[in-house]
Amino acid sequence: PGIFGLHAALRWLEENFEKVHEHEKALSARMLDGLKDVEGIYLAGLPTVEGRVSVISVDFLNKDNGICAFNQEHEYGISTRVGLHCAPLAHKSLGTFPEGTVRFSIGPFNTEEEIDTAVAAVKILAQTK
């Protein structure tokens, strides 16, 4: 049953926590660095990986974030989440309410190539009309 899979996953995470954390931190830094100077987007949150988790939120300025997220998935194979992420007050404080953001969640199985593809896709989508 599923409980055995959950147990195995928790054991794996306990054994690999530091490695996973460093991997996600490195990929997050790579993505932040790739997005920091992209015109046409607002990169929500802190500018570096210090003090943040491996979630990066982007607001496509003057574009529909939902359409940008759809294009990310259908043109580039990148799964994201779009909207207010059950946190409308956080988006009000970030200045992204009511549109929300496109959220990228980086995990232990993501690769540098996937991050580079995501950055390239954001750059293209931010510049297309």
Where are these regions (language model features)?
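Pyridoxal 5′-phosphate
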Residues: 1-129
